Amino acid sequence: MSDRKTIADSKRAFNHDFPHVIPSLYRRTTDELLVELHLLSHQKHFHPDALFAIGLSQVFDVFTSGYRPEAHVKTLFDALCRSCGFDPNALRKQAQQTLESVRGHDLEEVQGWIQQQGKGAPEALAKALRNTAGSTTFHYSRLMAVGLLSLLASAQGDESSDPEKLSQIAHELSESVGFSKARVEKDLNLYKSNLEKMAQAVELTEQILESERRKREQNESAKLNTGSSEQMSQGVEACSNIS
């Protein structure tokens, strides 16, 4: 990520790797992620650690829910990352390994690891926590806050399935990982708000598509019935002529 690209360069690289029309429902998210990744690629003290990888993967996966054609989703993620100098496969692997490292552990234990800045935690998580909590120069990204929230959600326990409780815990733990409480609260509130709006938009889109599908089926059925009626009428007329 050493080349000093402009945003125009990153967009050009993205369009080269993903030469497809993006549905309007997903265009804004794509543009925002592209700009954010571009800006992060120029931050001297930014490192794509596990919390960032988890957050990026989570935001992308959630906000591309229902994307069609499905085959384009992976290509879209890859193009976003590569156009800004990030390795999509490495980020996905990093996110997956870190999330898997906390599965099977209860939420209280995971909280303890975070509060102790990675002490006793699986190496994948400990490394990410050392990067943030142990540094005064690291560059924060809102995707890291989402990564922290998603990490907590992967732990076992009833509280792990309670979004409000998880957000509260993430807020309380933010300073332990070197994040600003105010920033984390703001970023997670915005994330949840956008999540609700996106879910509603996807649901509405699916309803519209389903309605259009039914109309097409009804029209096709009507055409078939009309054709059958015409054929029957012609047959009756032919019989009458013979008589």
From Swiss-Prot:
UniProt region (Disordered), positions on chain: 210-243
Protease is among the record's keywords? no
The UniProt keyword set, sorted, is: Coiled coil
Signal sequence interval, chain numbering = none
What's a Pfam family in this record? ThylakoidFormat
Gene Ontology CC annotation, any one = plasma membrane-derived thylakoid photosystem II
Where are the annotated coiled coils located?
Answer: 180-224
HAMAP family cross-referenced by the UniProt entry: Thf1
Q: What is this protein called?
A: Protein Thf1
